[in-house]
């Protein structure tokens, strides 16, 4: 098979027992998209952090990861690498989360590329820069031959940005270490972004599912790469359980919340962070009541923003 397309996911962060219904719905949307596309000459690549709690594992976690990898493999071959949340980087004697799961599945269509190395899969030359190995052992792009040299890495690359405005500063992991490759498919930073547009193109897919209020509501899903052109398209996966921040001033809910509540753009079952200023307790109670009319609210946290101290309003969020 000549692979022409790559589905690029990253940073799933499946919990031990929380949010599994939410994740299952998002994953099913992805699987339906892959099936709908009907691109037989494609592979699915997951760029690390499939698990969330490092080596703290639960039976439910094993079940969810096994289910997702198996369902993906029914549609396409699957390639995955290790993320820092899939292992304990501080104790190399501990086994990572993914090895026993993949070994138990014993599925020839699932390729777990745990170690640094060159892996030829069909017409693709995958080069893994494993976080479990020393950087000195990573082969350079120029030292490798191949029609499509694709570097797979999970880690913070210099000048990458997060949704909260933090910029990575790293002398160890710069874009220059990827010189000589055609494409670099990254995981670790949860904000979808392009670090370099060509020679090579270097891209973070971002988190598949919004993790918390520190991440923007949109920009979560996957990328679909065209191997020949070295280009990609962005595909968001709608999540009805998203994290929504609502800023209330003078007791007023912003108009955009009201107008977009039924647009299909906002989550229908949100976790709401309500930040308020110039608003008293009774007005907050009214605002929460109105929000619960607009949405099937999962939870509400309340924070005051017009003073230095931040406080939760007891009894209002139940």
Annotated model-derived regions:
Residues 2, 37-39, 227-318:
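Accessory, non-catalytic peripheral segments of nucleic-acid enzymes
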Residues 1-7, 118-128, 145-150, 198-202, ...:
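Beta-strand-turn-beta hairpins that frame and shape the catalytic cleft
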Residues 8-10, 43-49, 77-84, 111-116, ...:
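Active-site neighborhood of phospho(di)ester-bond hydrolases with catalytic His/Asp-centered motifs
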Residues 1-68, 140-147:
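N-terminal active-site segment of His-dependent metallophosphoesterases
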Residues 163-232:
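Conserved beta-sheet core of the metallophosphoesterase superfamily
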């Amino acid at each position: 098979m000549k692979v022409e397309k790559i589905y690029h996911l990253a940073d799933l962060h499946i919990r031990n027992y929380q949010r599994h219904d939410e994740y299952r719905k998002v994953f099913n949307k992805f699987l339906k998209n892959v099936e709908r596309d009907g691109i037989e000459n494609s592979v699915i690549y997951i760029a690390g952090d499939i698990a969330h709690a490092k080596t703290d594992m639960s039976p439910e976690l094993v079940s969810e990861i096994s289910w997702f990898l198996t369902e993906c493999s029914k549609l396409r071959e699957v390639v995955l690498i290790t993320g820092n949340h899939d292992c304990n980087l501080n104790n190399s004697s501990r086994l990572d989360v993914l090895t026993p799961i993949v070994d138990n599945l014993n599925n020839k269509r699932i390729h777990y590329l745990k170690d640094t190395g060159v892996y030829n899969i069909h017409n693709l030359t995958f080069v893994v820069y494993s976080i479990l190995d020393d950087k000195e052992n990573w082969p350079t792009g120029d030292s490798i031959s191949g029609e499509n040299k694709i570097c797979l890495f999970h880690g913070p690359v210099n000048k990458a940005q997060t949704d909260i405005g933090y910029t990575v500063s790293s002398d160890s992991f710069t874009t220059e270490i990827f010189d000589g490759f055609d494409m670099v498919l990254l995981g670790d930073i949860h904000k979808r972004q392009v670090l370099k547009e060509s020679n090579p193109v270097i891209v973070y897919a971002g988190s598949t599912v919004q993790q918390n209020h520190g991440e923007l509501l949109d920009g979560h899903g996957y990328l679909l790469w065209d191997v020949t052109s070295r280009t990609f398209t962005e595909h968001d996966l709608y999540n009805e359980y998203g994290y929504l921040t609502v800023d209330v001033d003078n007791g007023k809910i912003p108009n955009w919340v009201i107008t977009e509540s039924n647009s299909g753009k906002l989550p229908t079952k949100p976790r709401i962070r309500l930040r308020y200023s110039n608003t008293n307790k009774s007005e907050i109670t009214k605002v929460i009541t109105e929000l619960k009319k607009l949405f099937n609210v999962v939870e509400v946290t309340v924070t005051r923003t017009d003073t230095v101290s931040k406080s939760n309003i007891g009894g209002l969020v139940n």
